[in-house]
Amino acid sequence: MSIINKIIFLLPIFFFGLLGQLSAEEIKKIGKFKDWEAMVVTEATGKVCFAQSSPILQAPKSNKRDAKLFIAFRPAEKIINEVSVTAGYEFNKNNSITAASGKNKFKFDIKEQGFAWIADTKIEYRMIKRMKKGSRIMITGYNQKGSQTIDHYSLLGFTK
């Protein structure tokens, strides 16, 4: 899937959470499972199912950001376990964005429009596998000024 299609898909979802302006017909909530929500949206290419979560802890505390972690499924495009994240700001292109759970670390390769993705589906698969076993995942990113932010996500409810 192209970066443009990913951005077109994620921006309305992000703003739905931020502003609550999309109608129930556009994004349908399937359910809330502890710290995760499952939703479905219909695009021109077909249905897209996704799970999302907000951080349970953010650093620095003084920054008010709408960070989210997403896992998307696009059956019509044969895409499963597509991992993406937004920290609520435009990422610095010179610094890495990483996810860490236990001793496992994963790097987000693609950064566009305030979102980041993992380019390699094998790495996404390993990350999902780790998320199913873990209790928390930590996303580290850097804003345009180079300041570090760390978002801690609970994995309770990730496997329903």
Model-derived regions: residue spans:
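Bacterial N-terminal signal peptides that target proteins for export
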Residues: 1-9
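Bacterial N-terminal signal peptides
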Residues: 9-18
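Sec/Tat signal peptide C-region and signal peptidase I cleavage site
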Residues: 18-24
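A generic "folded-domain core" signal
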Residues: 24-160
